[in-house]
A protein has these predicted regions:
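An exposed acidic His-Trp-rich patch
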Residues: 30-37
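Short, extreme N-terminal segment that most often corresponds to the first beta-strand
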Residues: 1-30
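Low-complexity intrinsically disordered segments
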Residues: 39-176
Length: 176
C-alpha cells in the first residue's frame, strides 16, 4: 500500500507548483528526505521540474536493478515517472494560482508538503523551510505535522542519497 503525497513550492508570485509522489509519503520518509536533502529553492525547483514521482528515494531503477554502491554505501535516488517513460502531459508539474488551490488538489493524497522559500535579503532563513500537512481525512482541516529529524528508513553509514535531476532539467548529478 502506498502513502501518497503532493510536494509543492510557494513561488515568488504566490502561486504554487506541485508534483504527485506515489510511495512513502509519510513525514518519517518523504518529510525527512525533503527536509534533509531538498533544503534550497533550487533543489526543490529541480525536483518539481521533473514531474510526478513514483518514489522520492529508491535504491533501484525502473528495471528493478539496484543503484551502484559508492564508498560502500547504497546509492538512493528519486524515481521519476519521466524516466519510465510516461507521457509528459500526464506527469508534468501542476501550477496552482494560490495556496488554497494547492490544498484543493485531490490526488487522494495523505500528506501535502509545501516548501516556503526565504523572502528577500532581510529573511534570517537562508534556505527556506518545509511544512507538512495531514490531508488523509477530507472532513477535517489539514493540520500541520512535525517533520522528524531522523528516519528509520535511512542509515547514513550504509546509504547515500544522490541528486539525479533526470531527463527534464538536465542538471548534472550532485552528491551531498
Amino acid at each position: 500500500m502506498s502513502t501518497r503525497s503532493v510536494i509543492g513550492i510557494l513561488n515568488e508570485d504566490k502561486t504554487v507548483s506541485s508534483v504527485y509522489s506515489h510511495y512513502d509519503g509519510s513525514p518519517e520518509h518523504n518529510g525527512y528526505f525533503l527536509k534533509k536533502y531538498f533544503d534550497t529553492t533550487e533543489k526543490v525547483q529541480n525536483l518539481i521540474s521533473n514531474g510526478d514521482i513514483s518514489s522520492l528515494v529508491s535504491d533501484q531503477n525502473w528495471k528493478r536493478e539496484k543503484h551502484p554502491m559508492i564508498n560502500n554505501k547504497q546509492v538512493l535516488k528519486t524515481l521519476y515517472y519521466v524516466d519510465r517513460p510516461e507521457p509528459w502531459e500526464n506527469i508534468k508539474p501542476q501550477k496552482h494560482k494560490n495556496v488554497l488551490e494547492f490544498f484543493q488538489r485531490d490526488c487522494c493524497d495523505e500528506f501535502k508538503y509545501l516548501f516556503i522559500p526565504p523572502e528577500g535579503n532581510w529573511n534570517f532563513l537562508k534556505n527556506g523551510f518545509w511544512k507538512c500537512y495531514d490531508t488523509s481525512d477530507p472532513t477535517k482541516s489539514a493540520p500541520s505535522v512535525t517533520i522528524p529529524e531522523t528516519s528509520r528508513f535511512f542509515n547514513n553509514d550504509k546509504q547515500m542519497f544522490v541528486y539525479g535531476f533526470s531527463k527534464v532539467s538536465k542538471v548534472k548529478e550532485l552528491t551531498k
